[in-house]
């Protein structure tokens, strides 16, 4: 499993940082802001939805998620990346934000992105490292399946059909 990166902002308890746990398993690699480069970056401030069409970007450059605190989300608003995408709405399964729309842990966001671009096995492998992880797929199975087969132009309509 290669091509999964994270930008660690040191905003949370390091013991709860999901991407750091994945790094300990050799499933993700930390990068600094200069190391982001052309990687496909997940950010809630992107104008463009992630879709299956982005699989080629993942394959070529990798995927980078921002590991930070939702309580300090405004601190990343000013960060701009060359290739940035946002996830469509999904429900969190992590114990801190269970059932909240869009308040995903970094591993949930990473797994959702991988699922949407067609890397289901990798998404499951990442989530399996957390006791609550696979529940994320169960909780979001229908929207994830629809997002993963849709063109970018259809994502907003699918999101609205599930989450209003």
From Swiss-Prot:
The keyword Transport does not apply. It catalyses: an N(1)-methylpseudouridine in rRNA + S-adenosyl-L-methionine = N(1)-methyl-N(3)-[(3S)-3-amino-3-carboxypropyl]pseudouridine in rRNA + S-methyl-5'-thioadenosine + H(+). Signal peptide: none annotated. InterPro entries: Tsr3-like, Tsr3_C. One of its GO terms (biological process) is enzyme-directed rRNA pseudouridine synthesis. GO terms for molecular function: 18S rRNA aminocarboxypropyltransferase activity; S-adenosyl-L-methionine binding. It is found in: Cytoplasm. Keywords: Cytoplasm, Ribosome biogenesis, rRNA processing, S-adenosyl-L-methionine, Transferase. S-adenosyl-L-methionine binds at residues 18, 66, 87, 106. Its main location: cytoplasm. GO terms for cellular component: cytoplasm. Pfam families: Ribo_biogen_C. Its EC number is 2.5.1.157. Belongs to the TDD superfamily. TSR3 family. Aminocarboxypropyltransferase that catalyzes the aminocarboxypropyl transfer on pseudouridine corresponding to position 914 in M.jannaschii 16S rRNA. It constitutes the last step in biosynthesis of the hypermodified N1-methyl-N3-(3-amino-3-carboxypropyl) pseudouridine (m1acp3-Psi). This is 16S rRNA aminocarboxypropyltransferase.
């Amino acid at each position: 499993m290669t091509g999964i990166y994270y930008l660690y902002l040191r905003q949370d308890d390091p013991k709860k940082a999901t991407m750091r746990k994945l790094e300990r398993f050799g499933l993700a690699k930390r990068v600094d802001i200069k190391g982001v480069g052309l990687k496909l970056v997940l950010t809630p401030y992107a104008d463009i939805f992630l879709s299956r069409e982005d699989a080629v970007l993942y394959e070529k450059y990798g995927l980078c998620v921002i590991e930070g605190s939702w309580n300090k989300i405004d601190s990343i608003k000013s960060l701009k990346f060359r290739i940035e995408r946002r996830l469509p709405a999904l429900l969190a399964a992590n114990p801190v934000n269970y059932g909240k729309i869009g308040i995903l842990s970094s591993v949930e966001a990473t797994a959702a992105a991988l699922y949407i671009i067609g890397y289901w096995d990798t998404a499951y492998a990442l989530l399996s490292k957390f006791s609550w992880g696979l529940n994320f797929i169960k909780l979001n199975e229908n929207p994830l399946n629809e997002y993963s087969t849709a063109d970018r132009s259809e994502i907003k309509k699918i999101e609205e059909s599930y989450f209003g």
